[in-house]
């Protein structure tokens, strides 16, 4: 897998924005990606030094359309901790 295929999107919530001050960033990643692949992808894309990667698997939510039931797709979330001397990841364009 390519680095751009592993990292899908950043997760932007109040909780994740609060952890960005401590150089901890949260991303949605491919469900097949390992911690090592996530680490190499982040270092390759953003040119930073990753210290630790925590991942969590999220089940799909149950949804209904009339009498038919189904599930949304499952997700995998990665929390990436950067080293103290690495630069910040710019997620937003500040003009």
From Swiss-Prot:
A biological process from GO: translation
Pfam family, any one: Ribosomal_L23
A GO MF label: rRNA binding
Cysteines engaged in disulfide bonds, as pairs: none
Keywords linked to the UniProt accession: Ribonucleoprotein, Ribosomal protein, RNA-binding, rRNA-binding
UniProt keyword annotation of S-adenosyl-L-methionine present: no
Ranges in coiled-coil conformation: none
Protein's UniProt keywords contain rRNA-binding: yes
GO cellular component: ribonucleoprotein complex; ribosome
Family to which the UniProt record says this protein belongs: Belongs to the universal ribosomal protein uL23 family.
Assembly mode: Part of the 50S ribosomal subunit. Contacts protein L29, and trigger factor when it is bound to the ribosome.
Protein function: One of the early assembly proteins it binds 23S rRNA. One of the proteins that surrounds the polypeptide exit tunnel on the outside of the ribosome. Forms the main docking site for trigger factor binding to the ribosome.
Protein name as annotated: Large ribosomal subunit protein uL23
Organism: Levilactobacillus brevis (strain ATCC 367 / BCRC 12310 / CIP 105137 / JCM 1170 / LMG 11437 / NCIMB 947 / NCTC 947) (Lactobacillus brevis)
